[in-house]
Structure formats: structure tokens, C-alpha cells
Regions:
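Glycine-rich nucleophile elbow surrounding the catalytic serine of serine-hydrolase chemistry
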Residues: 179-189
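A catalytic-pocket lid/entrance helix-loop region that shapes and gates access to the active site
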Residues: 145, 189-191, 196-299, 425
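Cap/lid segment of the alpha/beta-hydrolase catalytic domain
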Residues: 93, 101-172, 215-216, 223-226, ...
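Conserved alpha/beta-hydrolase "acid-adjacent" motif
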Residues: 394-398
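Histidine-bearing beta->alpha loop at or near hydrolase active sites
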Residues: 420-434, 448, 466-467
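Alpha/beta-hydrolase fold nucleophile elbow
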Residues: 170-181
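Short beta-strand/loop motif that positions the catalytic acidic residue
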Residues: 386-388
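Catalytic-loop region of hydrolases
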Residues: 15-95, 111, 241, 254-255, ...
Length: 505
């Protein structure tokens, strides 16, 4: 049966009008539950131009011809979920990939759609039910908040699979999710709430504990501004970064400009305290205390229970994202529009103890995706790859370590879950990419091999480039393993490293 399916899929992939399927334009007449298809047209190879959006537009010059389907989903009377499904006109690999959002969503993820189609995938993305990058859509619209929380992704997945089946004459043999940040949260929510939607999920730097994450984010701003003189201007970040590396870089036995495991380093920024006049090379006493707060977890002052982990040594060059002149709007929006429902809410008034409790009570697991019970997903033979940059300055990487640990504990231990979930921590990488570490890697191929061939990823080769040229490769290892130098050969070549359990500090 599998051979017959593969032959049919191969035949369909060789034709711009799929065998057994339908033409692109006729998809506009397709009737699906609470779905209005608003457009279906063929886009020539390299001919797609993304609508104006947030940030620079990616290039689509090398994207092959595809059928672009646009639709609006209305699972509730107040829903207005926009989706796009991109279907390769030829060369379909028989698979489906849904791609995630960032921040508060509000826009189609065109770049990831193009990346998926380049690989032969039929792909889908949603704006999560609203337009724009703030959470103002949620004020007075609980159904739209539900769409953002989980419903838009699930409904997009259901509609996309139906559209794929109509176009090609066959549904996808494998379905994958690929997202980072909010997209990581969306992926974990799918695994927890709709365990049969996907065969494999990639969840990078997930914002899955959003209520606590945003308490922490505002607390970072508090640390910078609560006391006179606490604010650390960006011109001081390089000095802190350098001092952190001097304290941490060689702890893994190799001084290579990377901190393999920052949790083993107990860097104290007091070493930078100004001895004479203030300068970009030192920190004043209030700034030392502020920096200490950034590295430390936010805890409940009464119980001592951790609310959210702190930043790690190595993240300093990206501190401006949360530790700037004002609290990050993506975080304050949670309290302005969801918790207090008051556009006039002042972030300076945040109390981590009481506001965390209030946010948790308000959310009730709607947005947060912290349920460690993934048994239904694993029973479906689902595979989950998580990854997170150790130098992420926007979502503390300890959050991914904590969630991974909670799943392992719930499911009977890490040894029992290694066949279903693996976490890859990336030294020197920032939020979803960038940074001084090996920040380019192919998680999709690793997941495909795991799901389709039952070959679990023992390591994933990552690279770092300078001016377009690869200057270092390094294996990423399943947590808690780290890349260990074999003792000979270039430290810039992955072949000279092996994945090993870290030794005791």
C-alpha cells in the first residue's frame, strides 16, 4: 500500500495540474466548514512579492512555482483568521509543513512559507486571527484571544490538509510543525491539545510560559529603572560581555569564544565595579546590582518559588531588547490588554508576586503551554525537537530546560523519553538565531529522519558564518550532553568534537 501511495505521489509531483487532484484556480470553489477561500492562483517561479509588513522583506527569487491559496476561517462569530496555503506546482514531496509566528502574531509568516516550499513542502501559515503586532485585539474579544492562543493554528492545520488533499488528490503522508518563539509555544500547544495534528514538531525558544515570561520581562525593566542610577546604557554591554567570557569561556576545558553551558558559570558583575570615574569599561554600584538581577531568576518574595529563570552569561550584547529605556511592549501588552484590560496600565506598578498569580488565574492555561503530559502525542508516535540559544536575551533559555525536565519527569525519566523528545541548547546563539555561536542548522532534516526513518538525532551539525563564509562548525548535542573537544584538530571543525555528558564543575 505504501509503494502504491508513493507512486501516485510521484506522478502527481511531475504535473503542474496534479494527477487525481484539481487545478489551482478551481480551489477557490472548494467548500470547507467555516472557511471562505478568497483567492487561489498560480505564482510563477521567483515571482512572489510579499506584502508590506514588519521588518525587511525576505527574498523569494529561488522559490519555485506554487499555487497560492488565501482563506478566512470563522470558527466563532467573532473570528477572522487569515491563512495562506502554498502548494508546489511540481515536485511536491508528499508532506505538509505549518510554520509559526512571532510575538503577538498578526501577520502571515511569508519567509518560512517560502523556505518550506523550496524544500518541496505544501505549507501553511496564519496571522492567528488578527492584524498588527500588539495584543489590543484581545480587549473585549475573548474569541479572538482563543484564536491567538491555539484555535487559529489548529483550524489552519485542518483546512490546509483538506486543501492539500483536493489539490493533489492525496493528503500529506507526513505533517510537521516548525516555529520559534511564539511559534515554539504554538508547537507545544499543538502537541498538548491536538496530539494528532502533526507527526513531528520543531519548537524553538518557546514562549510557552507566556504569563511568567512577561512578568520576568517587565521585571528586567524594573531592575534597570527602579533605583536611581541603575540603568545600564548599551555602551557598557561589551565590557560586561567580555568579563563574562573571561570568567566562563574556559570552564569546559577549551577557550574558544563560546560558553558551552552557562549554568556552570557563576559570573559576578561586581568585578567590573568602577574604582575611579564612571566609564563604558566599568559599572557603578547600582549598575552592578541591576546586572545581578538580570542574571538571577525572578522569584516570589514570600515563598521563594521561581517565577522565571534569568539571563545567562553570554547574553549581554542583546540586553537592550528588554533592558532598554522602557519595558518591552510585547510583555506589557499581556497586562494591559489581557490581565488588567486597562490601556492605561503602568508597567512601573508590576508586582511579581501578586501579578503572576493574577496572570495565571486570568489565563487558566489558555495561552500558556506548560502541560508536561505529552503521552497522547507520543502515543501517536509524534516526535518533538526543541532548541534554544544559550545567549537568548528575550526568552531566558532556562525556560526550555525547565519544560524539557518537566516532560521527562512526568513521563518517567529522560531515558524513557529520549525516543520522543530531544532538546538542543545552542551555545552563543541569540533569540531564534544570530549571535556569536553556531547559529545555522537544519532541524527539519533531523526531524524528518526521526519521524520517517526512526533515526533519532544524536547530534545536529551547526555552523557560524562571517561575511557569508562559514568560519566554524560545531555539533549540537541532545541536552544535557555538550560538545567536547577530542583533543586534536581545528577547534572550528565539528568533526573534532563529540557529544558527551558534562563533567561535574
Amino acid at each position: 500500500m505504501r509503494t502504491v501511495w508513493l507512486l501516485l505521489a510521484a506522478a502527481a509531483a511531475l504535473s503542474a495540474e496534479p494527477a487525481g487532484g484539481t487545478s489551482c484556480e478551481s480551489l477557490s470553489k472548494l467548500a470547507l466548514p467555516h472557511t471562505a477561500i478568497t483567492d487561489a492562483q498560480v505564482v510563477a517561479a521567483g515571482g512572489f512579492v510579499a506584502p508590506a509588513g514588519r521588518g525587511p522583506a525576505p527574498s523569494f527569487k529561488d522559490v519555485p512555482s506554487f499555487c497560492r491559496v488565501k482563506a478566512t476561517l470563522t470558527p466563532s462569530a467573532d473570528s477572522d483568521i487569515k491563512i495562506e496555503v502554498w502548494l508546489p506546482a511540481s515536485g511536491w514531496n508528499g508532506k505538509f509543513q505549518a510554520v509559526g509566528n512571532g510575538g503577538w502574531a498578526g501577520i502571515i509568516s511569508y519567509g518560512p512559507l517560502g523556505a518550506a516550499v523550496r524544500r518541496g513542502y505544501a505549507a501553511a501559515s496564519t496571522d492567528a486571527g488578527h492584524v498588527g503586532g500588539s495584543a489590543s485585539f484581545a480587549l473585549g474579544h475573548p474569541e479572538k484571544l482563543t484564536d491567538f492562543a491555539y484555535r487559529a493554528v489548529h483550524e489552519t492545520t485542518v483546512a490546509a490538509k483538506a486543501i492539500i488533499a483536493n489539490f493533489y488528490g492525496n493528503g500529506p503522508r507526513y505533517s510537521y510543525w516548525n516555529g520559534c518563539s511564539t511559534g515554539g509555544r504554538q508547537g507545544l500547544k499543538e502537541a498538548q491539545r491536538f496530539p494528532t495534528d502533526f507527526d513531528g514538531i520543531i519548537a524553538g525558544a518557546p514562549a510557552n510560559y507566556q504569563m511568567h515570561l512577561h512578568v520576568w520581562s517587565v521585571a528586567v525593566a524594573h531592575a534597570m529603572h527602579k533605583e536611581p542610577g541603575s540603568y545600564i546604557p548599551p555602551e557598557k554591554y561589551p565590557a560586561i560581555h567580555k568579563a563574562a567570557f573571561e570568567a566562563c569561556d574556559s570552564l569546559d576545558g577549551l577557550k574558544d569564544g563560546l560558553i558551552q553551558d552557562p549554568t556552570r558559570c557563576h559570573f559576578d558583575p561586581k568585578v567590573l565595579e568602577c574604582k575611579d570615574a564612571d566609564s563604558p569599561a566599568c559599572l557603578t554600584e547600582p549598575q552592578v546590582e541591576a546586572a545581578r538581577k538580570l542574571y538571577a531568576p525572578v522569584k516570589n518574595s514570600r515563598t521563594g518559588v521561581e517565577i522565571f529563570p534569568g539571563m545567562e552569561p553570554g547574553s549581554e550584547l542583546g540586553w537592550a531588547g528588554l533592558a532598554g529605556p522602557n519595558a518591552a511592549a510585547v510583555a506589557t501588552d499581556t497586562f494591559t490588554y489581557l490581565v488588567y484590560k486597562d490601556p492605561g496600565w503602568d508597567w512601573h506598578t508590576l508586582n511579581p508576586d501578586t501579578d503572576t498569580a493574577r496572570a495565571d488565574k486570568n489565563d487558566k492555561g489558555l495561552i500558556d503551554a506548560i502541560d508536561p503530559n505529552l503521552k497522547p502525542f507520543f502515543s501517536h508516535e509524534g516526535k518533538l525537537i526543541m532548541y534554544h540559544g544559550w545567549s537568548d536575551p528575550l526568552i531566558a533559555p532556562g525556560n526550555s530546560v525547565n519544560y524539557y525536565g518537566s516532560v521527562a519527569k512526568k513521563m518517567g525519566g529522560a531515558s524513557k523519553t529520549a525516543d520522543e523528545i530531544r532538546l538542543f541548547m545552542v551555545p552563543g546563539m541569540g533569540h531564534c538565531g544570530g549571535g556569536e555561536g553556531p547559529n545555522t542548522f537544519d532541524m527539519v532534516s533531523a526531524l524528518e529522519q526521526w519521524v520517517e526513518q526512526d533515526h533519532a538525532p544524536e547530534q545536529i551539525i551547526a555552523s557560524h558564518s562571517q561575511n557569508g563564509t562559514v568560519d566554524r562548525t560545531r555539533p549540537l548535542c541532545p541536552y544535557p550532553q555538550v560538545a567536547r573537544y577530542k583533543g586534536s584538530g581545528s577547534i572550528d571543525e565539528a568533526a573534532n568534537f563529540t557529544c558527551a555528558t558534562p563533567t561535574a564543575p
